[in-house]
Amino acid sequence: TLSSRYMIYTGLTILVFLIYHLYQYTLRVGYDPAQYTAFISDGKVETFDVYKMIVAGFSNVWCSAFYILAILMLFSHLRHGVQSIFQTVGADSRKIRPFYNFVAIAYGAVICLGFISVPVSVLLGIIK
């Protein structure tokens, strides 16, 4: 399939995305702690305001575009993976192939649409 043919490229794109994602949101590189600090428990506990960080990050069109591209690559990976699961357990007959192809596409689509909705909502001004 097309997904299996481009698995190496989609996989490398997802790897670069994961590194970037960890760099940006876990290591918090580029975020001023004073600007993105939230206080919880009556001001006694200080933590990063992840909501503000996400809105600031996805307000950048290029950041959002790369995120969306990586998630579309993830769709291809998930679809291929779910199809492979059915084949691995021996459920690869012509009779049920349309069913597991549907399940693979539906699973990948639900996961990816959920992830893509965040940057799209920020870009459209739904999340501010």
Description of each model-found segment:
Residues 1-128:
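Membrane-embedded alpha-helical bundles that constitute the cytochrome b-like, heme-associated redox core
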